[in-house]
Structure formats: structure tokens, C-alpha cells
């Protein structure tokens, strides 16, 4: 028993967020299995699909909140799968631009039902899911502003 009641695991805000994140990541597994993607690879593809122009590795890392040591192996694997290419920027060789291949772009259609499938697995309606997303965005924004 903790000496301080505030140290009870069940009273911590962080623990249900952590547990929900892990459970949600597991829930994506079967939905992504046919495409052969892991959850982090799927997030990377989502970021690429939503980019107006091919991003640099740095821009993609910022969007995904991943450092280059984590992102580079993800990109290498997706490149080996034929879903994207990484090329040095012709105007600045320090920058690497990430571009979807035709197969990577086409995969977007194959996975179009994944977001709805996840909402269904959550056991909440769309309005509740959107409210949760808004609250989480607010928390992230606040924590980033105070970091």
C-alpha cells in the first residue's frame, strides 16, 4: 500500500491513457494485417497521405513526433515494401524527401475502412470519439506549450 494515497495506480490519469494507447495499438493489428503494416507504419502512411507535398524526413518526424533514430528504420522498411522512396533534395543534400510510390498511394484506398473499424472497436459513437480526440488534442497542446 502506498504511503501517500495520491500514489495509487488507479488514481493516476496517466495510467488509463497508457493502457488505452496500448489496447488501441493492439486493436489496429488485425485491421492492418492484410496490408502487412504495423501500427507505426500505418501512422507514417497516414502522415504521407495527408501531406500536400512530399515532406522531408525532418518534417515527417515533427508531424509524427518521432526522432530520426525511430523514424529512419520505419521509412527503410516502408521503402523496402515498395510504398515510398527517400531521395536527397537536389537543392540541399542534407535534406531527404519522402515520396509515396504508386503502391503507397494505392494502399490508401485499401485501408479506407480502418478508421471506422477502429471507432467501432472502441465501443463509443462517433460524437464521443470526436470529443475524446478534441480533449486529447487540447491536452497535447497544453503540455507542448508548457514543455
Language-model features and meaning:
Residues 1-35, 130, 141:
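N-terminal leader segment of winged-helix/HTH proteins
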Residues 1-5, 102, 124-147:
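C-terminal regulatory/oligomerization modules of transcriptional regulators
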Residues 15, 22, 26-67:
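N-terminal helix-turn-helix DNA-binding core of bacterial DNA-binding proteins
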Residues 20, 24-27, 64, 107-125, ...:
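Alpha-helical linker/hinge and terminal dimerization helices associated
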Residues 34, 50, 77, 85, ...:
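Conserved amphipathic alpha-helical interaction elements at protein-protein interfaces in regulatory
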Residues 57-58, 69, 76, 96:
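Residues within helix-turn-helix
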Residues 76-134:
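Charged, amphipathic alpha-helical coiled-coil/dimerization segments
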